[in-house]
């Protein structure tokens, strides 16, 4: 089928699945990982899936183990990542009669899954070989078209544990089935998941590339195999239109993407890009984490074009767009012939806007370099500015939700786009941050996780995944004593003590002691000058490491406001001198 990674959780009812997974791992048919926490295991598998673009599987026993898979299933659903959830169950005769460890688990995950595959009620042994292979193949296709989680609930009757001799007999007579030449397609799978609502897949319309417009690139949610064609289609559209490109760090666009405006989040927050009612808008993928962008897009009114990569659910919380759900490449192939004879003179109406924004962007980036040097006390904006610059270009980055992903949106420079960048922008939770990052590192190689203290502590069981496989993960922990994001969301209107208790929720846990308890190498960095050496040390290790940096969330919140205000004053001063036109 294509399954390469499987995460196995402990259990007795899942014994037949465990023995099968072990046999396949011994013959190098898949990579087997183990995890004692099902919630963590599911996010580890999701990390494999996110990195490779193909589904990984997680196997659990029956009971509450199944409920722990829901957070990862929700994230897979919202972020369009394939994931297989295989749960062992008791036979139907043991349901609703007080039997031990027997619950109605077949319904636990249904709201977040593309498909629920239910095995025979009296036991999976009733499936013929042909039926079982067809069942597995349909599950694989359903997990990828459109991508999301699939739940296979598999009842097993006793006996559950074969002897070693019985296992040898089975393995001797088994060989992996070759997938049929005509795979199940998205069309005959009804394209969207069962129960999907809000489909807005109307016929595409053509924008006018010879009138001013802007491209908004959100997080990439397509399949890995489609990414290069997506990037090339955008290059061709931008070359034709000359439109500026405002890209999210999660957009998977390369650093040499023409028209890239890196400072757009700060410029929008400061009101420096103005309101352009006549601008056309091409939106790619889901909405970014920027509230300034949402407010700005509202000023354009309706008629915007939103293109998604196969997700036919409505992805426009503003309700202002026509949505085309079959991808940018398909849309471009449908329309590009209209402008095949266009020449450079056709761009005369669009080029002034791009040139103006590029000049403003260049001044803004130079000013940020002056304000955020690699020296002195560590601040969160400075970390966002420098971490990407200090890392090898091929190294992937995972950004925890809340503050890190927003800071990198605002303060990271163009070097961020020289690498793949991941985050939870599906359901935007902090659940499973460390575990998913372990999966990314196992699949991709050296990876950096940037996390706040609450996000890391919330998924501290992810440290258990460090052994024995020792994924090359460098964790940069921003320890600011609680939920720093709430300092930015304007909720600090309550008295200080109430704010700390109700929102920030600081925890009395030493992350270095916690790392030591899991045998994780760790160190603390006190100033920005020491950051390069700490990263070099972390990348030199053979497994996960923790680098702790302590920041002050109140001071960093004030600093963000000062940077926004200072940028406005700086650019206005330059404008008064005639160097730029605001």
Curated annotation (Swiss-Prot):
Binds 1 thiamine pyrophosphate per subunit. Its cofactor is Mg(2+); Mn(2+); thiamine diphosphate. It catalyses: isochorismate + 2-oxoglutarate + H(+) = 5-enolpyruvoyl-6-hydroxy-2-succinyl-cyclohex-3-ene-1-carboxylate + CO2. Keywords: Magnesium, Manganese, Metal-binding, Thiamine pyrophosphate, Transferase. Transmembrane segments: none annotated. Pathway: Quinol/quinone metabolism; 1,4-dihydroxy-2-naphthoate biosynthesis; 1,4-dihydroxy-2-naphthoate from chorismate: step 2/7; Cofactor biosynthesis; phylloquinone biosynthesis. One of its GO terms (molecular function) is 2-succinyl-5-enolpyruvyl-6-hydroxy-3-cyclohexene-1-carboxylic-acid synthase activity. It is an enzyme of class 2 (transferase). Catalyzes the thiamine diphosphate-dependent decarboxylation of 2-oxoglutarate and the subsequent addition of the resulting succinic semialdehyde-thiamine pyrophosphate anion to isochorismate to yield 2-succinyl-5-enolpyruvyl-6-hydroxy-3-cyclohexene-1-carboxylate (SEPHCHC). This is 2-succinyl-5-enolpyruvyl-6-hydroxy-3-cyclohexene-1-carboxylate synthase. It comes from Prochlorococcus marinus (strain MIT 9303).
